[in-house]
């Protein structure tokens, strides 16, 4: 069995812990029953991951597989990772969604993706990454009484993501610690109206309006101070035609939405200005986690 799962970009500026979308940058995991458990890791951060005593995917997979079957079988796991760690591209959510899905598939127990999303809450209490990782597309998600409610919209093929991946990380915990304890009403209203406009733009496919309505007063500015070059990234991307330019999750990656024809000029200028950063043009993923048997 082979399972693939996409990277995700969450928050999208003002949509804190609520908005997210899936990118066509995928981790792939091959799982085969075996006489003994073995793990092979290739791709992004492979050398670091090989040094860890515990494998997060394997632990989650085995827990759910045992719960579903009552068995403690052995498996060969082969990872080919393309999602970088700790860069705000949903690497943890990708692991969680893929592991739970793989357990159900290997146990041959029927499931729906909303079941996978809600099980994932045990490991990731914020639904903005886990939902698009499971479903693909642009997702709006709300957590209420330990249940995720969500809506999904397919992202048109004429759009691209230009992602800027810095050469250093921003710790998610440190990013959350940088948040204020209290916010004034004006800032809260700004975020509500901006997040609402982003949602309406994606569902109506009227993306031009994004150039004028994306504004965050809750988290971005403080988090971006950890990688101050990101302020220049945003300035250049918007100048070169990006529809919106926001921190991806808690960072350090910066997400830029653009029309396909504008993406290449944005990419070229950013690449010339930030030679130590990794710049990628990515299509969007409308499928989410996917299994090949």
Swiss-Prot record:
Pathway it works in: Amino-acid biosynthesis; L-threonine biosynthesis; L-threonine from L-aspartate: step 4/5
A Pfam family that the UniProt record links to this protein: GHMP_kinases_C
Keyword presence, ATP-binding: yes
Key word Cell wall biogenesis/degradation present: no
Record keywords, A-Z: Amino-acid biosynthesis, ATP-binding, Cytoplasm, Kinase, Nucleotide-binding, Threonine biosynthesis, Transferase
One GO term of the biological process aspect: threonine biosynthetic process
The protein's Enzyme Commission number: 2.7.1.39
Annotated ATP binding sites: 84-94
Catalytic reaction list: L-homoserine + ATP = O-phospho-L-homoserine + ADP + H(+)
InterPro entries: GHMP_kinase_C_dom, GHMP_kinase_C_sf, GHMP_kinase_N_dom, GHMP_knse_ATP-bd_CS, Homoserine_kinase, Ribosomal_Su5_D2-typ_SF, Ribsml_uS5_D2-typ_fold_subgr
Subcellular location: Cytoplasm
GO cellular component, one term: cytoplasm
GO-annotated molecular function: ATP binding; homoserine kinase activity
Domain of life: Bacteria
Entries under PANTHER family matching the protein: HOMOSERINE KINASE, HOMOSERINE/4-DIPHOSPHOCYTIDYL-2-C-METHYL-D-ERYTHRITOL KINASE
Family: Belongs to the GHMP kinase family. Homoserine kinase subfamily.
Role, per record: Catalyzes the ATP-dependent phosphorylation of L-homoserine to L-homoserine phosphate.
Name of the protein in question: Homoserine kinase
Organism per entry: Nautilia profundicola (strain ATCC BAA-1463 / DSM 18972 / AmH)
Gene that this polypeptide is encoded by: thrB
